[in-house]
Regions:
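Conserved catalytic-loop aspartate of Hanks-type protein kinases
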Residues: 205
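Activation segment signature within eukaryotic-like protein kinase domains
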Residues: 128-129
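Protein kinase glycine-rich loop
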Residues: 28-34, 39
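Conserved short submotifs of the Hanks-type protein kinase catalytic core
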Residues: 95-109, 113
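A short, aromatic-enriched beta-strand patch in the conserved N-lobe beta-sheet
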Residues: 89-91
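AlphaC helix of the eukaryotic protein kinase fold
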Residues: 57-78
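Protein kinase catalytic-loop region centered on the HRD/HxD motif
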Residues: 132-144
Length: 333
């Protein structure tokens, strides 16, 4: 190559995987890609543990870069919740790509579990609903919206716990904003009013939770995109049609009613959510109470109507394994 040849000075940025290898991570393997990042499974050598590292790829625009920082901030404020994925570390590669380190969950997501194994049993879905409603409620108490509650964002741990992940498009009150009218979630799990151009709200997260439970019970989304269907046509069905009746799938009346209400097209009077933003978490709290009561009856049918044995709304969220007590059989299998 001759002197002064432009190829002689051309520089190619190293891959994120290669850079992670120089940041204390070993056995770096790509395990997934999202709208704005790549996820790697790595070994964190200094702590002898396997972790998942989400890296913001260099080719993404500033909007998606800002979205990644929103995830860091939101997830940091929620660290410690038993049903929300924890952040273990944040950093940046030598070329400036930011990353977050999270626990690695080989059990995969709820979406993968349903796709591979079909619908979950009623008691599993009720347990899932109680815990996810508690997770969303906790986020709402901090003024945080998830904006994309769906099966793919619920990870299943080795300890039998569901954990809500990917607050990458979350909104923190007083912080970052998303342009009104921009749909940043997954259409089949996005509230009708958001598809119509309204900004996301706590009620929209309640809708996403209801749509997720519908999918877990039936094996498919209530308004799943049909083969050959245009996205506009799918939007039209979501915004104009009633939610399919879960009783036709053999789901009890009370459970069907809770999910139908959570997925109501009316975000104010239809969903279990008062209009005052100060009490926005009550929407998920009401859903938790309904699901927790039904879950209690499914598990303890002989205790129906025994007064003192009725569970409180938060009881289901407290039924957690002791820290460090590994379960031999996952309830998701």
């Amino acid at each position: 190559m001759g002197e002064g040849d432009p190829l002689d000075t051309q520089r190619y940025p190293p891959s994120p995987a290669a850079e992670l290898g120089g940041s204390g991570f070993a056995d770096v393997q790509e395990i997934g890609r999202g709208g704005f990042g790549v996820v790697y499974r790595c070994t964190q050598e200094d702590l002898d543990r396997t972790v998942a590292v989400k890296v913001l790829t260099v080719e993404l625009d500033e909007e998606n870069r800002a979205r990644f920082f929103r995830e860091q901030r939101a997830m940091g404020r929620l660290t410690g919740h038993p049903n929300i994925v924890n952040i273990l570390q944040v950093g940046a590669t030598d070329s400036g790509c930011p990353y977050i380190v999270m626990p690695y969950h080989p059990q995969n997501s709820l979406e993968a579990r349903v796709r591979e194994g079909g619908p979950l049993a009623l008691d599993q879905v009720l347990r899932l609903g109680v815990k996810m409603a508690g997770a969303v409620e906790s986020a709402h108490r901090l003024g945080i919206l998830h904006r994309d509650v769906k099966p793919a964002n619920i990870l299943l741990t080795d300890y039998g716990e569901p954990e809500l992940a990917d607050f990458g498009i979350a909104h923190i009150s007083g912080g970052f904003e998303t342009a009104t009218g921009a749909v940043t979630g997954s259409p089949a799990y996005t509230a009708p009013e958001v598809l119509g151009g309204d900004p996301p709200s706590p009620a929209a997260d309640v809708y996403g939770l209801g749509a997720t439970l519908f999918s877990a019970l039936t094996g498919h989304a209530a308004f799943e995109r049909r083969s050959g269907e245009q996205v506009v046509a799918q939007f039209l069905r979501i915004t104009t049609q009633e939610v399919p009746d879960l009783r036709e799938h053999g789901i009890p009346d009370d459970v069907s009613a809770v999910i139908a209400r959570a997925m109501s097209r009316d975000p104010i009077s239809g969903r279990p959510l008062p209009p005052t933003s100060g009490n926005s978490y009550e929407g998920c709290n009401a859903t938790t109470a309904s699901l927790s009561t039904r879950w209690h009856f499914v598990r303890n049918p002989m205790r129906r109507g025994t007064g003192s044995n009725r569970p409180r709304a938060a009881d289901g969220c407290r039924s957690l394994p002791r820290r460090g007590a590994r379960r031999d059989v996952s309830p998701w299998n």
